[in-house]
Amino acid sequence: ADNVIDVNYVKEMNKVFDSGYKVVTSYRNSKNYDTNWITAGYSLWFIREAKYLNNPRMMIKTSCAVSGTGYLVDSSIIKKNHGWKCNLLTEDIEFTVTNILDGEKVGYCGSAMFYDEQPTTFRQSWNQRMRWTKGFYQVLFKYGKDLFITMFKEKRMFVSCYDMIM
């Protein structure tokens, strides 16, 4: 485990958790952003993810998306599912989608930051992104129909379901 968290990470995550969210994701940052252009690119991607995806989602009270490992889960969700049920290549996306389909909104805490190490070579980055691409399609093929149906069946979940399909 190469992740590092800020000093107030747990305190900040608990604020969002205490506001009613059973799943809370945080600001993902690169531990080795200054190694080279590849790691710097990951940092820019994470800024985009935080500031232009999860932050606006939180502002309009739709579901955010878990990315990587920096998230909190209420034990009631694990108990309800009889353990961890997400096993696709992108289990973070699968976890987000299954929670949305179960009626849970994922919250976002931009003031809780965690850092993880990113690939440093083009080949490592390529292989990781190919895994992510395959994983995205696994999630789409497994849950796409349910997301589409729920999008129109449950009007309050339209934006969250649409967002995950896109």
Predicted regions and their residues:
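The conserved acidic donor/metal-binding loop of glycosyltransferases
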Residues: A1-V4, N87
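Residue-level signature of catalytic and energy-coupling elements of molecular machines
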Residues: D2, V24, N99
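Short, non-transmembrane cytosolic segments of multipass membrane proteins
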Residues: D2-N3, D102, C109-K134
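Long helical/loop segments within the catalytic core of UDP-sugar-dependent glycosyltransferases
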Residues: V7-C86, M130, Y137, F141
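Basic/Trp-rich segment in TM-proximal cytosolic loops or flexible interdomain/linker regions
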Residues: I60, T120-M166
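Catalytic donor-sugar/metal-binding loop of nucleotide-sugar-dependent glycosyltransferases
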Residues: K61, N87, T96-Y115
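Short, hydrophobic alpha-helical packing/hinge segments within bilobed ligand-binding/sensory domains
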Residues: F95-T96, S125
